[in-house]
Amino acid sequence: MTATPMTSTAPGTRVTARTSTYGRHMSGVLVAAFTLSVVHTIYAWMAGIEDPTFTVDTPLAWGFYAVGFGIAVLARRTERWAQRTVLGYLAIVLGIAFFYYPTVFGQEQQTVFGWFENDVYVGLLVTATYLGVQRLRRTTLTPA
């Protein structure tokens, strides 16, 4: 007895694989991370639980998000210097997330949305870093 795999296409139908780039996916992941962070910053400001040094009124926050979204655009570039710049930035931001942010993430900020934003934001940064490392190594992903 031989097994025949089921297909969802009619016989003779040609299916072409969709392709994409690491840069496009990294950019999308970074835009999602920074958008979530912006939403949380606005939420914390409106709720009065923000870190006073990082609010919608401070130049630090505006600068951070301008650079973050700029890095998301830079992630689409194919040059090695751009790839290294993005990975260097991600290393710095992850260092801040792991070593500095816990010192200012006080009881007042530890809301359900605060924890959600923190965990998802860091997860997205780690995902972007993984994609960036694979891209820098010139790893090609193929369907199994």
Q: What would you call each of these model-derived segments?
A:
Residues 2-12, 136-144:
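Short, charged juxtamembrane terminal tails flanking transmembrane helices
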Residues 50-60, 108-120:
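Non-cytosolic membrane-interface motifs at loop->transmembrane helix junctions
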Residues 19-28, 122-144:
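Membrane-water interface at the C-terminal end of transmembrane alpha helices
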Residues 20-32, 80-89:
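Interfacial segments of alpha-helical transmembrane regions
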Residues 84, 98-117:
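Membrane-helix boundary connector in multi-pass membrane proteins
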Residues 85-102, 123-126:
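Hydrophobic alpha-helical membrane segments
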Residues 32-37, 54-76, 88-95:
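Core segments of alpha-helical transmembrane spans in multipass integral membrane proteins
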